[in-house]
């Protein structure tokens, strides 16, 4: 009996909430709600607007350096390895490549946003 009462109450409550869900949005309908929203872009404008290649290159550079930093995060746990000299040489080589790539990006004006 208790189980039957709980199932009935749950079913009625679900039906009531479903009816309210379909009925309530029709009360406050206005033109702005009917328009599609796509992340701040106007869907009626042409989709092929000019894209800043500088922004794209900075974004790709950020992703590459972010990935390299994520690989460096495991370095403290790697210090517990049995083959410590190899791990240190590899880490120093990795950090050197990271620093050289940053210096190259800097000298090629890849990090300048003002141009």
Curated annotation (Swiss-Prot):
EC number(s) stated in the UniProt entry for this protein: 7.1.1.2
Membrane topology designation: Multi-pass membrane protein
UniProtKB keywords: Electron transport, Membrane, Mitochondrion, Mitochondrion inner membrane, NAD, Respiratory chain, Translocase, Transmembrane, Transmembrane helix, Transport, Ubiquinone
Pfam families registered for this protein in UniProt: Oxidored_q4 (PF00507)
Membrane-spanning ranges: 3-23, 55-75, 84-104
Main location: mitochondrion
GO cellular component: mitochondrial inner membrane; NADH dehydrogenase complex
Top-level class of the enzyme under EC nomenclature: translocase
GO BP, sorted A to Z: mitochondrial electron transport, NADH to ubiquinone
Gene Ontology terms for molecular function: NADH dehydrogenase (ubiquinone) activity
Localization annotation: Mitochondrion inner membrane
Catalytic activity, reaction form: a ubiquinone + NADH + 5 H(+)(in) = a ubiquinol + NAD(+) + 4 H(+)(out)
Quaternary structure note: Core subunit of respiratory chain NADH dehydrogenase (Complex I) which is composed of 45 different subunits. Interacts with TMEM186. Interacts with TMEM242.
Function summary: Core subunit of the mitochondrial membrane respiratory chain NADH dehydrogenase (Complex I) which catalyzes electron transfer from NADH through the respiratory chain, using ubiquinone as an electron acceptor. Essential for the catalytic activity of complex I.
The family this protein is said to belong to: Belongs to the complex I subunit 3 family.
Protein name per the record: NADH-ubiquinone oxidoreductase chain 3
Gene name of the record: MT-ND3
């Amino acid at each position: 009996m208790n189980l039957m009462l709980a199932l009935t109450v749950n079913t009625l409550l679900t039906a009531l909430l479903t009816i309210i869900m379909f009925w309530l949005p029709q009360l406050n309908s206005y033109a702005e709600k009917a328009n599609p929203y796509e992340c701040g872009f106007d869907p009626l404008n042409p989709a092929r607007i000019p894209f800043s290649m500088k922004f794209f290159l900075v974004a790709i550079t950020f992703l590459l350096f972010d990935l390299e930093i994520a690989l460096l995060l495991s370095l403290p746990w790697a210090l517990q390895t049995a083959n410590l000299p190899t791990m240190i040489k590899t880490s120093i080589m990795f950090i050197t490549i990271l620093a050289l790539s940053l210096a190259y990006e800097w000298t090629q004006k890849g990090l300048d946003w003002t141009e």
